Regions:
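Surface-exposed amphipathic alpha-helical segments
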Residues: 35-45, 90, 136-167
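A general boundary/transition motif marking the beginning of the first structured unit of a protein
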Residues: 32, 70-74, 145, 149
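Sec-dependent signal peptide hydrophobic core
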Residues: 5-9
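C-terminal motif of bacterial Sec signal peptides marking the signal peptidase cleavage site
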Residues: 14-16
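Short aromatic-glycine motifs in intrinsically disordered, low-complexity regions
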Residues: 25-37
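Conserved polar/disulfide-associated segments of primarily extracytoplasmic proteins
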Residues: 46-137, 142
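Bacterial signal peptide processing site
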Residues: 18-20
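Positively charged n-region of N-terminal signal peptides that target proteins for export
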Residues: 1-3
Length: 167
C-alpha cells in the first residue's frame, strides 16, 4: 500500500508550478494568485510536488491532501467536468455523495467517491470552486475504511479557504 498511495498524490496533481510559490501563515502566493487555506492538524507531512500548489501526506496511513489553483488555460468548464478531470486514473468509480455547496461566496461542487487505483481501493473527497477566473481544487484520498480518520483536515482546509487576489 505504501508504494501505491504516493502515486495517488501524483495522479491527483493538476497542472501547477512550484517556481515562485510561497506558503506563509496559511497563505499560498504564486504568479497571478494568492489564497488562504485552513490549517491541517499535526501528523501531516507537507510534500513538495511540482504539479501541486500544496500537498500533504501521512506515510504511515497513506492519507493525502492536495490543493491547487489554475488561473490560465482552463476554458471555464462546468464544476462537474472539473471533478471528472480529478478522477482521471481511478477505476471502478462509485459516487457516494455529491452536493453543491458555497465556498468563499461561490458555488462549489463537493464529491465523495469510492474508487480503485492500480487495483487498490480508496475513498476520495473532491471539491472544486471557481472564483475570479481561477479554478481551485481540493482533494482528500484515504485508504478504504479509513476515510473518517482525517476527513476533518480536508474540511478545515476548505473552511479556511479565501481567494486573496488574482491578477
Amino acid at each position: 500500500m505504501r508504494h501505491v498511495l504516493p502515486i495517488i498524490v501524483l495522479l491527483l496533481a493538476a497542472p501547477g508550478c512550484h517556481r515562485g510559490v510561497r506558503f506563509e501563515n496559511q497563505v499560498l502566493t504564486k504568479s497571478g494568485v494568492s489564497y488562504r487555506v485552513g490549517e491541517v492538524s499535526p501528523g501531516w507531512e507537507r510534500v513538495m510536488l511540482s504539479s501541486n500548489d500544496l500537498a500533504w501526506f501521512i506515510e504511515d496511513t497513506g492519507h493525502a491532501l492536495q490543493v491547487n489553483a489554475t488561473c490560465k488555460g482552463h476554458d471555464d468548464p462546468p464544476l462537474d467536468v472539473l471533478v471528472r478531470h480529478l478522477l482521471m486514473g481511478f477505476t471502478e468509480r462509485q459516487l457516494v455523495e455529491e452536493q453543491k455547496v458555497v465556498v468563499d461566496e461561490r458555488d462549489a461542487l463537493r464529491s465523495h467517491y469510492r474508487a480503485k487505483l492500480d487495483g487498490v481501493p480508496v475513498e476520495l473527497l473532491l471539491l472544486v470552486v471557481k472564483k475570479d477566473n481561477c479554478v481551485y481544487d481540493f482533494s482528500y484520498v484515504a485508504p478504504l475504511g479509513r476515510f473518517e480518520e482525517r476527513v476533518a483536515d480536508f474540511e478545515a482546509l476548505v473552511h479556511g479557504f479565501h481567494a486573496e487576489r488574482t491578477s
